Amino acid sequence: MRMVSVRCKLARYLEDLEDIDFKKFKMHLEDYPSQKGCTSIPRGQTEKADHVDLATLMIDFNGEEKAWAMAKWIFAAINRRDLYEKAKREEPEWENANISVLSQEESLEEEWMGLLGYLSRISICRKKKDYCKKYRKYVRSKFQCIKDRNARLGESVNLNKRFTRLRLIKEHRSQQEREHELLAIGRTWAKIQDSPVSSVNLELLFDPEDQHSEPVHTVVFQGAAGIGKTILARKIMLDWASEKLYQDRFDYLFYIHCREVSLGTQRSLGDLIASCCPGPNPPIGKIVSKPSRILFLMDGFDELQGAFDEHTEALCTNWRKVERGDILLSSLIRKRLLPEASLLITTRPVALEKLQHLLGQARHVEILGFSEARRKEYFLKYFSDEQQAREAFRLIQENEILFTMCFIPLVCWIVCTGLKQQMDSGKSLARTSKTTTAVYIFFLSSLLQSQGGSQENHNSATLWGLCSLAADGIWNQKILFQECDLRNHGLQKADVSAFLRMNLFQKEVDCEKFYSFIHMTFQEFFAAMYYLLEEDNHGEMRNTPQACSKLPNRDVKVLLENYGKFEKGYLIFVVRFLFGLINQERTSYLEKKLSCKISQKIRLELLKWIEAKANAKTLQIEPSQLELFYCLYEMQEEDFVQRAMSHFPKIEIKLSTRMDHVVSSFCIENCRHVESLSLRLLHNSPKEEEEEEEVRHSHMDRSVLSDFEVAYSQGLVNYLTSSICRGIFSVLSNNWNLTELNLSGNTLGDPGMNVLCETLQQPGCNIRRLWLGQCCLSHQCCFNISSVLSNNQKLVELDLSHNALGDFGIRLLCVGLRHLFCNLKKLWLVSCCLTSASCEDLASVLSTNHSLTRLYLGENALGDSGVGILCEKVKNPHCNLQKLGLVNSGLTSGCCPALSSVLSTNQNLTHLYLQGNALGDMGVKLLCEGLLHRNCKLQVLELDNCSLTSHCCWDLSTLLTSNQSLRKLCLGNNDLGDLGVMLLCEVLKQQGCLLKSLRLCEMYFNYDTKRALETLQEEKPELTIVFEPSR
């Protein structure tokens, strides 16, 4: 390789750099590491040097081999991987031989030829830059405006003025079917609001994760339908063309409709790029010559039709080759075609799994929609009048379900459109209802305003075709329709054009032969209407040609039988809309506005379906109770809902969102026959007669939450507002059958508790068991709870665990517990921030209240002194306490004499829970004195994690042979050792030992000890031994 030849090649590489990259190259040239043995070039000489001058300077100062190495290093540093690879691939074989005079002459001629080529390329480069500017201008013009879905001819909206920022997160989320579940977006958003999830910055979308990583070449935007994927892709195009985004990274951005490409004619990638460019004969060859400077925006991967399981041989590698659209895009995605090009792909979650099979490394970004602040911003941007915007936003804020749904930009637009049309017509916003069905009905009727009798008939006939088309698409899981599909359902091209104008359909401007509903939920809405529209006198669908293929079965039983079976959950919203549409008031409204007849015949079938699901033995089947409630809520017809709810003897649902609370409140307040009501978030309700549940309850295993669950619970603060509480609690005073209420884990708070207390004192309230664990209660509500205990003789079980009641709250509570009319039998006060100061009040209750038999005080700092005070009253033979829980109460052996005294005098006490207290061997020795007394009737003793060793096993051995009442002994998580356990085994073999259950969890045994336990179990099958070697 001759020197001049190296100079020409370096100059050509430098010529490929854009102005900004060329400046970066010069900057890095100054910072080139001196340890690499290169001479730095003075800045004065490089500052004004062009490509040839700079190449010459590099070689003159450092020689051709070092100059080549410098260029490679800097290409990598400025992220020009293409030039780095090219320079690496074309690197000469360096020789030290002297160059002859003849060679120098040949080199001089070659240099002149190279310079002439350089001047020619400079001219071409200028033309290229001129075309780049022309293309950017074209993109700005094309993407600066958008058309609202109901825009009239010539109407458009400035994208920059309307666009509202969406929340993007980088973390990869679960692949649940949520494309058509608008409300599920609200749930997802609510769950992560308090979680430390960082938002994604669009400017850094293609940047490497860290300084040691490669740049990102493929980004996937995922989000449900209507969440804003397309509008975000268009905004990226506009910002790039306006020189606000990716200026240093991409020379060209091309926006590709996946739907259009997959359904269009065969073409090459060059043809596809040309279709995105202005004017004839764009420089395709020059554009694709630098694929690393190209970004393809593929919008709507989920709408891409075609197979994606081709072998790699079937893929396209030549940008000039004509192929099917799906082959072209698959080749780009799989990096067989222009592998150095970058991709930004938008898709719905349901297609993500298919996409992942095609991708290599990719950055996944999820679009979560609008935050609360952004929703307000959207309203302000949509309404030109700020006062109108604030009035509309206040209305939706008060309306929780719609406010939640407005996380989704499309729904936000629908709501704003409907409200603005009402405002413009002078109608009251109070008429706007609160369900999805009501919003869609109003939107539909606004678009189908009659224009004379003939227009009414025309709309009515077209409605038939729309509904049958929608239902056919639902059953066949089809969202794209060709003109032949429209004709098969009696829809003419003129009808479709009219509906496009009125925004019931969306027709792609560049792909006129294919149609789709503007949103999947609209298709589901029309599919639901298909089951309600009356047929004509001949029993046939109006306006449907005889050549039409077989229409979907209109039997609603078939629809309900298939509920939940579709992979994409298509039928969930169809059934919800079905319930919403049979509301008699809405039916009359629709019949008047749409000039059609809607049948009410299916009401009985829907009622039977609800009854069958309500009486199902398992709650795990589809649909869940909550989903049934959503259906009834959508209907908003109290008589029907009350009949349906009469089939729910037991309600047990988990609430996750505000919307869940609203829906459950509506249904529960219309329920008259429920016997047990559990609105739970994180806990399971305790069982009346199940020993293990009570033990678990006393141990507070249920209080162990993961960090996420805690954050999630905190994110639900104020969900149970006073108005919601009154709605839910109204059923308590009107339903004599309702005896159990579990609200554990809900943020009830003192205001909600006060509302509940009012209800509990109503004569018609028959609640016997009430669980209020972790409900954000404080001492301020204890006076009202005390009043309930004094006046409600029916309440026998109360759980107030995990509420910061404090000593003062317990003092107030004890006033009611001491009352003559208090019949409470079981009381949980676990983890209520109590100290020994509360024990005086509790002791006074034990000496006067003869109904209380179970008291759980675990997870409170009672200490030895506090327990000593309690024991003075418990040891009274007239105290009826049977079960006492003192788990993790800060006890030592100091309290054991008092406990031993209780055991030797009170024959009513049968269960004592002392886990997590440092009693030690001495404590057990003192306890055994009471346990060996003839008056002791204790059946269950739990001493897990009590700092015991093998020394206590002698005392326990004596206990096991002498005490005839003890049936269960728990010694887990103690250091008893093999010797201690073997001693117990010898005693347990004796016939005089009546123990039925021994728990030795979280303890290590050697082989001999383990074998001894197994042998004992075999020889004495009536004895259950539970042991798990520690790991």
Swiss-Prot record:
It is found in: Cytoplasm, Cytosol; Inflammasome; Cytoplasm, Cytoskeleton, Microtubule organizing center; Golgi apparatus membrane. GO terms for biological process: detection of biotic stimulus; inflammatory response; innate immune response; negative regulation of non-canonical NF-kappaB signal transduction; NLRP3 inflammasome complex assembly; positive regulation of inflammatory response; positive regulation of interleukin-1 beta production; positive regulation of interleukin-4 production. ATP binds at residues 164, 223-230, 519. A motif (KFERQ-like motif 1) lies at residues 352-356. One of its GO terms (molecular function) is DNA-binding transcription factor binding. The modification Phosphoserine is found at residues 5, 156, 195, 198, 262, 292, 331, 723, 730, 801, 1030. Residues 126-129 are annotated as: Required for binding to phosphatidylinositol 4-phosphate (PtdIns4P). Residues 217-533 form the NACHT domain. A lipid is attached at residues 125, 832-833, 839, 953 (S-palmitoyl cysteine). A motif (KFERQ-like motif 2) lies at residues 601-605. The pyrin domain (also called DAPIN domain or PYD) is involved in PYCARD/ASC-binding. The FISNA domain is a critical mediator of NLRP3 conformational during NLRP3 activation. It becomes ordered in its key regions during activation to stabilize the active NACHT conformation and mediate most interactions in the NLRP3 disk. This is NACHT, LRR and PYD domains-containing protein 3.
